[in-house]
C-alpha cells in the first residue's frame, strides 16, 4: 500500500511555553454557571437568565468565536463581555489528514501552572458515508497503563476541564465549517457522533466529562443526541451506574480479555475491579436494552486473546447483557510487542459470536498512517523519533 498522508503543521512549536489568558473562556459553562459569571460582572439579576440563554445560543449553536458576532446582544453588553471573558477553544497546533480521510488535531491547552510548558491532547475525526464520528480525549495522558495502548505509555499529567472537552467538539466544527447558520439552521452536520475514546479514562474525570457531555447533547446548543454519544471506560466500576444516571449516554466497555489473569496484564485496572464486578455493573446500567445495547470493545491480539475458546467464554460472560461486540484489529505502534490477529482468525472469532446471537462487527482501522487509530493516540509532547516514524511508515505499508 502506498502511504499518502497529507500533513499540515501550523507555524508553531508544540513545546513552547503557553501563557494562560488573563480572561477566562466561557466555553464549558452550563446555563446556571453562565448566569453566575454574568452576575460577577454586574449584570442585573433580572437579566441573567435571558442573557445566559443568548450566550448559550451563540456559543454552542452558532459557534461564534468573538462576542462582536453576537448581534442579538447590545453593543454595550458585548464590549463588557469581551473585557472580562473569551469564547476561546483549545489551540490547534497541528492537523494531519490520513489517506482515508481521517483527521487528527493536536490541541494545546493551558498548563494551569505559571511557567510550565503547554499541555496537549489529540482529537480525531473519522468521516464515514452515514456519519461523522469525533473521538474526544478526557485527560492529558493516562493512568491505566494498558499494555497494548500507545496512550498508556504517556504518564497522566492532568484531567481536562469541561471546557477543554467541549472545546474539542467545537474545534472540529470550526475546522470542518460545521456550524449552523441562518441558511442551514437545521441542516445536516458533519460531526454526528461523539465517542469518549481518546486519551484518558473518562470515568476518572467524572464531573468534567458529565458536565461536558450534557452540554454537547443539549438540543438547544451543539445538539448531538445522547444516543449518538458513547462513553468508553476500561471499567471504573463505581462510576458506571452513576454515568447512566447522571449522563445517560451510550456505554462502551474496553474488555479485551475474558479471563482475569490475562485482563490483569492487558488492562491493569482489572486487578482493582475484576470481570465479575465489571459485568455486574453493566447489568445494572440504567437504560440498557436491546435498543440501547452496551458495546464491548475487544482488541484482537495474535495468539493472546483470539482463540475460539476465548470467543466461547466471551459469549458465556455476556449472557443476560444487551450487548454488541466490536472486534478491533490491533493497530501497531513503534515499540509494541503485540501483533494483530490473522484476518482468518478474526473472521472465525466474529462468526462464532454472531452465530451465538450477538452483533460482532470488525472495526475498520482508520488513520493508522497518522497514529490516529484506536489505541494509537499520544500527545506530541513526547515526540516520535525519526526511527519510530520510519517504523510506523513500514507498518502502514505492510497492511
From Swiss-Prot:
Source organism, top-level taxon: Bacteria
Chain segments annotated as coiled-coil in the UniProt record: none
Annotated Gene Ontology cellular component terms: cytoplasm
Name of the protein in question: Dual-specificity RNA methyltransferase RlmN
EC number: 2.1.1.192
Localisation per UniProt entry: Cytoplasm
Chain sites annotated for binding [4Fe-4S] cluster: 142, 146, 149
Organism, scientific name: Rhodopseudomonas palustris (strain BisB18)
UniProt keyword annotation of Zinc-finger present: no
Catalytic activity: adenosine(2503) in 23S rRNA + 2 reduced [2Fe-2S]-[ferredoxin] + 2 S-adenosyl-L-methionine = 2-methyladenosine(2503) in 23S rRNA + 5'-deoxyadenosine + L-methionine + 2 oxidized [2Fe-2S]-[ferredoxin] + S-adenosyl-L-homocysteine; adenosine(37) in tRNA + 2 reduced [2Fe-2S]-[ferredoxin] + 2 S-adenosyl-L-methionine = 2-methyladenosine(37) in tRNA + 5'-deoxyadenosine + L-methionine + 2 oxidized [2Fe-2S]-[ferredoxin] + S-adenosyl-L-homocysteine
UniProt record similarity statement: Belongs to the radical SAM superfamily. RlmN family.
Active site: 122, 374
Alphabetical keyword list: 4Fe-4S, Cytoplasm, Disulfide bond, Iron, Iron-sulfur, Metal-binding, Methyltransferase, rRNA processing, S-adenosyl-L-methionine, Transferase, tRNA processing
Cofactor(s) listed: [4Fe-4S] cluster
Gene name of the encoded protein: rlmN
TM segment ranges: none
